[in-house]
């Protein structure tokens, strides 16, 4: 485990500038290693509490069923018991996995896996599409933050610079309704339908050229689950809807859910985060990173000089984007730039565009 975590624990020092504000130099570790251990303990305690609570409810429901006098009453209580049993199994599945975050050697990867690559899907996009130019659009208000997570980050503009840009582990083909490769080059499913194993594309890099690694997906959860951000929904979501993430090597990892689901590879496509960008991460994260956009795996990025506070935000196509020749991305992302100008009145936007 220490081999994977050491890089996150080294103190770093530098200065950054954002939207004309200078933030003082910091010198601190991220706290990642302690977080992983503490969060595993927290989840173990929480699961134990949930099981105790469900067992108590089960006793009450069984008594209620025995005391039921009508078929309708028995049917209702039986349905409640069925739902409770399902929840108990979900929690037991998680207890059996022992940890929320795990670090293992590649030799511990299950050998019976059948790997898929989705390369039999047809291309997406039109080969006749020409690249170049600027796509102009407008927003009515300037976002209160450009942070990806934390307080006020879930604004109407986040989709334009994050959700519609960042790449997932796999894509879902609009015609075949099958998975195709994205950040992951190959994937495999566990027999119980709860876990997806991923092999990252060795070519996958962030927009600053840094390689994407398995541990980045653990780090992506760390920055969302730590006490340094205000994100109650995300914290509750990942706590309840995910069971485990295991790193086997720099390019291989798995994600498990508490129970089997359809479209499993989409549900297990957890967010990644570039650790080198968050080496100032700490209690003042939301203020320090207020106007900073992290390196992306997608085709567009926001340069600091293209943030005109109160006026506009411009995305630029990543030079030498790692997926520019990818079968499923080569004919998309054609504009050189995407510019969003603040125009409060729709009628004015109609005149301009």
Predicted segments — roles?
Residues 31-53, 57-60, 64-67, 71-83, ...:
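Aromatic- and charge-enriched surface segment that lines or borders ligand/interaction sites
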Residues 156, 160-167, 173-175, 269-341, ...:
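Gly/Pro-rich hinge or "lid" segments in bacterial periplasmic/extracellular proteins
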């Amino acid at each position: 485990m220490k081999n994977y975590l050491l890089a996150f624990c080294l103190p770093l020092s530098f200065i950054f500038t954002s939207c004309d504000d200078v933030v003082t130099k910091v010198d601190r570790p991220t706290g990642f290693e302690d977080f992983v251990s503490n969060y595993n303990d927290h989840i173990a305690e929480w699961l134990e509490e949930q099981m105790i609570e469900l067992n108590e409810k089960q006793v009450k429901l069984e008594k209620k069923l025995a005391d039921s006098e009508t078929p309708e009453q028995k049917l209702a209580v039986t349905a409640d018991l069925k739902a409770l049993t399902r929840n108990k199994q979900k929690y037991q599945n998680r207890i059996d996995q022992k940890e929320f975050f795990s670090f293992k050697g590649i030799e511990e990867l299950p050998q019976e896996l059948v790997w898929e690559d989705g390369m039999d899907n047809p291309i997406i996009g039109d080969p006749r599409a020409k690249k170049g130019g600027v796509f102009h659009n407008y927003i009515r208000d300037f976002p209160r933050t450009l942070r990806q997570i934390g307080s006020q980050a879930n604004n109407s503009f986040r989709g334009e610079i994050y959700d519609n840009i960042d790449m997932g582990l796999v894509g879902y083909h609009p015609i075949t309704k099958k998975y195709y490769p994205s950040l992951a080059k190959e994937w495999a499913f566990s027999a119980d339908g709860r876990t997806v194993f991923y092999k990252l594309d060795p070519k996958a890099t962030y927009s600053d050229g840094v390689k994407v690694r398995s541990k980045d997906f653990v780090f992506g959860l760390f920055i969302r689950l730590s006490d340094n951000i205000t994100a109650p929904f995300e914290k509750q979501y990942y706590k309840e809807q995910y069971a485990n993430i295991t790193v086997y090597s720099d390019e291989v990892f798995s994600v498990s859910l508490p129970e089997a689901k359809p479209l499993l590879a989409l549900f297990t496509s957890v967010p990644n985060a570039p650790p080198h960008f968050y080496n100032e991460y700490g209690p003042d994260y939301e203020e320090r990173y207020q106007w900073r956009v992290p390196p992306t795996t997608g085709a567009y990025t926001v340069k600091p000089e293209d943030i005109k506070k109160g006026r506009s935000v411009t995305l630029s196509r990543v030079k030498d984007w790692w997926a520019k020749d990818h079968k499923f991305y080569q004919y998309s992302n054609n504009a050189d730039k995407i510019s969003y100008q603040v125009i409060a009145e729709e009628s004015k936007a109609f005149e301009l565009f």
